[in-house]
Amino acid sequence: DVVSFERLAYKVFEEVGEDNLEVLDDTGKNLIIKRVLEQNKDRLKYFGSNLSNTGFVSEMKSVISEMLQYDIKPDVMQDAAGAAYSDSEGSAALQYKLDDIVLVYNAFAEYIDKNYITKEEILDKLCSKVTESERIKNCEIVFDGFTGFTPVQYNLMTILLLMCPKIYVSLTIDASERENSVRGREELFFMSKDCVSKLYKICDEEHVKVLEPVYIAGKVVPGKNVIVNVNSRFKNSEELDFLEQNLFRNNSGRFNKKTDNIVIYEGAVAKEELTFAAGEIIRLTRLCGYRYNEIAIVTADMDGYGKLAANILKQNDIPYFLDYKRHVTDNPFIAAINGALGIIENNYSYDSILGFLRTGMSGMEREDIDLLDNYCVAVGIRGRGKWHEPWIRKFRGTVNNTDLEKLNSLRTMITDMLDPLEEVLKSKESNVADMVKALYEFLVREDMEQKVSVLNDSEYTGDEYAQLYKKVIEVLDKMYALLGSEKVGIKEFNKILASGFQEIKIGLIPQTNDCVVIGDIERTRLDNIKVMFFVGI
């Protein structure tokens, strides 16, 4: 089997009868962290004023996730906070930040205790159960594609070293390097060497025999056990092979031949870079026999280059796939949900009502929205009371009885839409489960799934909108399951829901196999690429 650490854990849990775990994902963590932040906001020394900042909950979630992943306990952070305080040159702000992180971490852990585990804790659980697995005891395990391991992963590997007949670890390192000699973080292969050093230390402490390292290289290296691989990936490109051998090396050489496989182009702006890339792609596919799926555009700045690259390729009729998961809080559907809740929270303020109507999800025609807008401004319609009583006032003789009849019809359309939701959200008897159910019924009543399914604009495709509706329902399901019995006000309910929406990301799969991939230099995995454009360097 080829599995990730997480998938290995689930296979072991299934074998040993530990497969009923409730695992908390990032959205669930966001929801709970937002709740505990609101509960403890008066106790926060530093972050109290940050609670309403966009992205703050996700940042706090990331900190807690890293603490879990690297097995950093709250008492370690508490000691660090104390050290910051006792240091004469220490920062009080740093101490307060660490104190706040510990407070939120402990509150989060207490909330999920005995009911859920986070995905970062899955390997901890695996460490306690893997020795019960008969299947693992007879396995030879190969760890491939890693540059290093987290402390929890090293703990698991320690257990596996004592259980399994053989374990292989493949790492990237030059055959001329000393694999167990770590001089500094600035070394080219520091991460691989550091990993080897830690594994050697574990083997030494556990009295595990280490076999002679095997290198796969393009040539024999004296004193090393080398398997010579003559089928180098750069066998047809002398300059790329030279670049690999000399890039970031202390004693790098100079390539004095003509370079056919490396081209440097400088554009004044991003659009110029990408226009050049598009022209080259057209030339390569039409004149040189390349397929689109053999070409990729890679950048470290997907926000600045991804969408622009997609637009330029589209203009040139070049099929592409944008490998990019993005946040979706800036679309009409999310805006409509926030708008409807905002109307109730803000007592039918002018801005909240018009903001909701302008999303295009209310079912009201644009001309009717303009008519409402003009009347509300001219007559001064403000507050829930005004919206729940008949409008009879005319202004400047421009509104006749027919217009008033139309306006009142539009008024009742809005109040009838929101009243059932408002009744539940403002009831002192309602808990989060009741509020989530009322919001879901609002979405169903207003046929939001159908409205979302026909959306397709310059920002999002129809397929992305289809994903979005399902993701929103998943957030509601998680709120219902994780926070259902909690009692909160409408303001806090809206904040918790917004924190869940912040974690929603959508992405697509390629519509065709033959397309240019536009991807991130860290995230995107590329296979069988023959031409690569690095942009935004």
Where are these regions (language model features)?
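Polyanion-engaging groove/track-forming segments
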Residues: 1-537
